[in-house]
Swiss-Prot record:
Catalytic residues (UniProt): E137
Statement: the UniProt record of this protein carries the keyword Iron: yes
EC number of the protein: 3.5.1.88
NCBIfam families xref list: pept_deformyl, PRK00150.1-3
Lineage of the species this protein comes from: Bacteria, Pseudomonadati, Pseudomonadota, Gammaproteobacteria, Lysobacterales
Disulfide bridges in this chain: none
Catalytically driven reaction(s): N-terminal N-formyl-L-methionyl-[peptide] + H2O = N-terminal L-methionyl-[peptide] + formate
Protein name per its UniProtKB record: Peptide deformylase
Protein task: Removes the formyl group from the N-terminal Met of newly synthesized proteins. Requires at least a dipeptide for an efficient rate of reaction. N-terminal L-methionine is a prerequisite for activity but the enzyme has broad specificity at other positions.
Species whose genome carries this gene: Stenotrophomonas maltophilia (strain R551-3)
Amino acid sequence: MALLPILEFPDPRLRTKAALIDAAEVTTPAFQELVDNMFQTMYDAPGIGLAATQVDVHKRFMVIDVSEEKNEPHVFINPEIVAKDGGRVYQEGCLSVPGIFADVTRADTITVKYLDRDGQQQELEAGEVLATCIQHEMDHLDGKLFIDYLSPLKREMVRKKLAKQRKHVA
């Protein structure tokens, strides 16, 4: 397994809309290795979710594990939200927008259809942190970032803060 480089805002590749994955590709050794590498990258970061777009792979899938013990890995391939209910404000962060956190309102519970790691059709009802994480990662697959939900003024403040952070690292 290998760690993958994570793209960071304002990299324009984060705005790429991911393409659907052919079901036949899911069980290939190359795809399975990519999934393993994404989990390793996510756990190492550390994070609770990682969309393929964030590692410059523009295919419609993501890996998530919101458990404290990091023992409940989920792979969502070609995910589609088929039902939403309620609203909840959650403070979100992102591996592609390091050090920035902001309140975002999302559906409280969702039902998502997807292919699992074995290419089997699944449907999951998710709530709380898992629902938030699924919606956040699905935004990545559509070329959206959580900071897009902020006002233009706050988004510009984020851009300046990240530029300043990069200057101190260099």
